[in-house]
Amino acid sequence: MTTYVLTAIGDDRPGLVAALAAAVDEHGGNWVDSQLALLAGKFAGIVQVELPDERVPAFLEALPALSEEVGLSVEAAEGTAAGEEKGPCSVLRLHLLGQDRTGMVREVTSALRSQGATIDGLRSWTREAPEGGGMLFEAEAEVRLPEDTQEADVREALETIAAELMVDLELDAPG
């Protein structure tokens, strides 16, 4: 079996996920994991699939037809099997909340990068602050630290950024 990661985007409409799932199934594939979202009228998704080695070429050739048939643009990249991609590490959950402003994601991710951390998952959104206080930016992330990175160093780097940005930041073990 070969593992592929698919990225898909298209104008939102009924049947997009069904069309992609059918293409995977028609080639003997298995839908392993996915993250799907609707953002600004666009459907976007990332999907991990496993395919029989001998069916991979036909599957890859079939993907452009999804664009013609349902307006779904799909890219495929060979991945690693589940569980093979991560070495020894620790994982932290990050939650950030503060007044929305440009550069927040850049600042936080730069601090994480400086500590050698990897972002395994990130979800962010904006919402109106209570009593007309403008827009709030909120983010949740799962952060992976390499074996040689100290959690205290990551925490210190993020707390420094949080103070500069004037945001609330929580960092704890997932659970």
Residue ranges, per PLM feature:
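A conserved regulatory-domain signal marking ACT and ACT-like small-molecule sensing domains
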Residues: M1-G175
